[in-house]
Amino acid sequence: MAERPARLAPLANGVVFVVLATGMAVSAAFVVVPAFGSETIGFDFRGTLWDPAIAIRHGLPPYPDAVTSEVEVGNPALYPPLLMLLVVPLTLLSWSAGLAIWTVIQIGAVVGALAILRVRDARCYVIALLSLPVVAGLGWGNATLLLVPLAALAWRWRDSWPRGGLIVGLAIASKLFAWPLIVWLLATRRYRAAGLAVAATVAFVVAPWALIGFDGMTTDPGLLRVSEC
């Protein structure tokens, strides 16, 4: 009798997975997908990265003025220019092609994060890609998904302060709200990694800004304040 539960366990797990995956797919189809139209697909990508990258390519300022009327128009750039510079090559393509490549990069980021954490169960990958945050992130083209593999690397390399510190610095320079990673390093007494993370953040912020002549560096804090109002 003890063998029967053992034989049924894989079947039970399979049923749970199918039910969970189906539920998440239905939620994505009926909750997230209807929210997107032709004007909203890639909305975050276009406003925060694509349009600023085009401006950089043409030698124009990538940031709007730090006034409410400018911030309320579309979805303007608010973060340091590191990711904008990385997107510049994509702007040589059409918008549709650039967005398609960006979406593939986002999917690769989610899959890569699980691979970095040595997740081998294919069901975890399916669940992750069907989750509402990921589906919404893909729909908006939000760069936050790119922070997922960086956070995974920070965890995997947590005992290697040079690599861990650099990765945390790169994550924060990409999107400033990743700064709690430094708090985590300090809380776990990884002081050298935390110090390097601070230095790396400064380097990854200042160097890209230097490439665009520090355009918008003094107004960006004002942009962040205005956007929160």
Enumerate the predicted regions with their spans:
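Membrane-interface alpha helices of multi-pass inner-membrane proteins
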Residues: 162-186
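Primarily membrane-embedded glycan-assembly and transfer machineries that use lipid-linked glycans
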Residues: 1-164, 188-229
